[in-house]
């Protein structure tokens, strides 16, 4: 019996945040510039026995199991897991339930502003689908994940996180009035990526936020046609396009200026976007060498994304940790979106001589194989003996 593993990357929202949320997105069209980073949501799935459903989330110290008929009893501790399971049954298994063991973990805390819950839904959805032999493409995967969170569960938010997790990499995404989302992958030069990675720091002050409160405030301002908030959201939408153009041509100083303008506009969309703790951290970072920064995600807490002079990275990090507490870390960008792979519980043994020959040839080519790992090509799969 195969064990399916999957992961979906978390993301940094660079520009356009909030324009992907209803009713703004359908009324005016949203624009999002985002990039995925080397932090992931993971899902590990295998078929259960009998009629048992078992969910585990070690990073949240949660575990639970129930019969298929008693699935609702798991909703309180595992609302996302239950909703994903129900969708997979309805969309890909003809309405027929099946026993399942599903474990998950995420590289960032809830409320981090990195799209962790949406990436988790994408990872669970793709992995559970793969377990029953289905493989939705990135557009279908993102749309279904969005529906699970926003429609099935009624969770507040936009669409950018699901599409970022499904596609991966640098993307400029736009929504149409009919709800269609178009993802435009960006080709960013390697030296531009290297400079951005050298300039980027993430600061986490230890305070997560409830994004639904911030989003509800923004939605209310759009519905009530709050002039300043609506103008600010239009500005954010326009800035996303400007930022994309600057990034493509490699204008990092211009990109940083655009990021700063976007943050200033975002704070006008809701009084909940920033708070004294965020402003204090922002000022400390600026005085130490930060060029521009913004809170990732809806706002109100989570990670502060900073563009700094690469020569002053250590100075900025030490100042923040000394004066504000929390932690500062670098991050790297990733190209790929959600992916699954399988780990056979048992495989047919291969002759030691063949395995040694393969390992020797690969070693001569500079490729190292670990004992027990699975090597796959387009034609065959071998298991290297332990």
Curated annotation (Swiss-Prot):
SUBUNIT field: Monomer.
Site residues (Transition state stabilizer), renumbered to this chain: 11
Gene behind the chain: hddA
Organism: Mycobacterium tuberculosis (strain ATCC 25618 / H37Rv)
Protein's UniProt name: D-glycero-alpha-D-manno-heptose 7-phosphate kinase
Keywords (A to Z) from UniProt: ATP-binding, Carbohydrate metabolism, Kinase, Lipopolysaccharide biosynthesis, Magnesium, Metal-binding, Nucleotide-binding, Transferase
Active site per the UniProt annotation: 161 (proton acceptor)
Domain of life, source organism: Bacteria
Signal peptide: none
EC nos: 2.7.1.168
Enzyme class, spelled out: transferase
């Amino acid at each position: 019996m195969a064990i399916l593993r999957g992961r979906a990357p978390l993301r940094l929202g660079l520009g356009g945040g909030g324009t992907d949320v209803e009713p703004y997105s359908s009324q005016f069209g949203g624009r999002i510039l985002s990039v995925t980073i080397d932090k992931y949501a993971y899902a590990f799935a295998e078929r259960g026995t009998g009629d048992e459903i078992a969910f585990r989330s070690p990073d949240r110290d949660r575990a639970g199991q129930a019969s298929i008929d008693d699935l609702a009893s798991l909703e309180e501790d595992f609302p996302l897991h239950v909703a994903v399971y129900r969708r997979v049954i309805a969309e890909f298994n003809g309405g027929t339930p099946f026993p399942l063991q599903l474990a998950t973990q995420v590289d960032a805390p809830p409320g981090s502003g990195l799209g962790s819950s949406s990436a988790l839904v994408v990872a669970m959805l793709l992995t559970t689908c793969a377990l029953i032999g289905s493989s939705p493409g990135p557009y279908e995967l993102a749309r279904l994940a969005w529906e699970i969170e926003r429609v099935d569960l009624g969770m507040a938010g936009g669409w950018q996180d699901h599409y970022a997790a499904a596609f991966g990499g640098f993307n400029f995404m736009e929504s149409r009035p009919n709800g269609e989302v178009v993802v435009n992958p960006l080709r960013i030069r390697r030296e531009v990526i290297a400079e951005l990675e050298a300039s980027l720091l993430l600061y986490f002050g230890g305070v997560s936020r409830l994004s639904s409160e911030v989003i509800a405030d923004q939605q209310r301002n759009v519905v009530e046609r709050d002039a300043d908030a609506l103008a600010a959201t239009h500005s954010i939408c326009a800035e996303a396009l400007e930022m994309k153009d600057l990034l493509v041509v490699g204008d990092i100083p211009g990109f940083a200026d655009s990021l700063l303008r976007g943050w200033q506009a975002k704070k006008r969309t809701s009084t909940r976007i920033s708070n004294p703790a965020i402003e204090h951290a922002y000022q400390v970072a600026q005085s130490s060498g930060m060029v521009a920064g913004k809170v990732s995600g809806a706002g109100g807490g989570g990670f502060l994304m900073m563009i700094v002079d690469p020569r002053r990275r250590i100075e900025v990090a030490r100042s923040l940790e000394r004066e504000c507490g929390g932690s500062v870390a670098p991050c790297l960008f990733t190209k790929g979106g959600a992916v699954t792979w399988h780990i056979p519980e048992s495989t047919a043994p291969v002759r030691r001589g063949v395995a040694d020959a393969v390992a020797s040839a690969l070693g001569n080519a500079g490729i190292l194989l670990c004992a027990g790992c699975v090597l796959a090509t387009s034609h065959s799969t071998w298991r290297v003996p332990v």
